[in-house]
């Protein structure tokens, strides 16, 4: 995976630079890049893009035809570049890196919050407020439920994980007793 990230990084940075300078705004581009990544991740699309009977122009036309959103010329050019360099199927990795660049630019981060039970809106707001103080970033929460946690929450912000779940506490206790 590290190799794919390395190959995808220059494309993500170039796309981010173009999006940052576009009057449409980063949010519009983030949605567009996400849609392109979803299309590229589709197994049928991956198979079609690997068809040796299609030339680069046909691959570009087929792919752009599958995108429901209106594509600006810069996005069409980007798709053509990816097809020409045989990198179109890297779009999911490029999209992940694009979002990371966008978040860094905006001083925000994605907070993956996993709870043992459904959290109310008030609980999520309170948790996000505390986490924003801890991490020093504006956080965008994505909340999910995993009953295997037994209780508590697990929060991942970037590569940092804060796990206060009962499951994690029991695992630490088990490790301490086994030592």
UniProtKB/Swiss-Prot annotation:
Record keywords: ATP synthesis, Cell inner membrane, Cell membrane, CF(1), Hydrogen ion transport, Ion transport, Membrane, Transport
Protein name per Swiss-Prot or TrEMBL = ATP synthase subunit delta
Q: Fill in the subunit field for this protein.
A: F-type ATPases have 2 components, F(1) - the catalytic core - and F(0) - the membrane proton channel. F(1) has five subunits: alpha(3), beta(3), gamma(1), delta(1), epsilon(1). F(0) has three main subunits: a(1), b(2) and c(10-14). The alpha and beta chains form an alternating ring which encloses part of the gamma chain. F(1) is attached to F(0) by a central stalk formed by the gamma and epsilon chains, while a peripheral stalk is formed by the delta and b chains.
Subcellular localization: Cell inner membrane
Q: Which family does it belong to?
A: Belongs to the ATPase delta chain family.
**Which organism is the protein's source?**
Bordetella pertussis (strain Tohama I / ATCC BAA-589 / NCTC 13251)
Q: How does it sit in the membrane?
A: Peripheral membrane protein
Q: What does the UniProt function comment say about this protein?
A: F(1)F(0) ATP synthase produces ATP from ADP in the presence of a proton or sodium gradient. F-type ATPases consist of two structural domains, F(1) containing the extramembraneous catalytic core and F(0) containing the membrane proton channel, linked together by a central stalk and a peripheral stalk. During catalysis, ATP synthesis in the catalytic domain of F(1) is coupled via a rotary mechanism of the central stalk subunits to proton translocation.
Q: Which GO terms describe its cellular component?
A: plasma membrane; proton-transporting ATP synthase complex
A single GO molecular-function term is: proton-transporting ATP synthase activity, rotational mechanism
Q: What is its main location?
A: membrane
What InterPro entries does this protein map onto? ATP_synth_OSCP/delta_N_sf, ATPase_OSCP/dsu
Q: Name one Pfam family in it.
A: OSCP
């Amino acid at each position: 995976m590290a190799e794919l990230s390395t190959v995808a990084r220059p494309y993500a940075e170039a796309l981010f630079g173009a999006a940052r300078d576009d009057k449409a705004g980063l949010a519009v581009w983030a949605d567009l890049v996400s849609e392109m990544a979803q299309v590229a991740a589709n197994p049928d699309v991956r198979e079609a893009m690997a068809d040796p009977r299609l030339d680069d122009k046909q691959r570009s036309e087929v792919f752009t035809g599958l995108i429901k959103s209106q594509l600006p010329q810069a996005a069409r050019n980007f798709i053509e570049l990816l097809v020409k360099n045989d990198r179109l199927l890297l779009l999911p990795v490029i999209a992940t890196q694009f979002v990371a660049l966008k978040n860094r630019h905006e001083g925000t981060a994605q907070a993956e919050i996993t709870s043992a039970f459904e959290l109310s809106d008030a609980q999520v707001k309170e948790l996000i407020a505390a986490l924003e103080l801890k991490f020093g970033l504006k956080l965008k929460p994505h909340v999910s439920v995993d009953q295997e946690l037994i209780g508590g929450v697990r929060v991942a912000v970037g590569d940092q994980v804060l796990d206060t779940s009962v499951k994690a506490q029991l695992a630490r206790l088990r490790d301490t007793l086994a030592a």
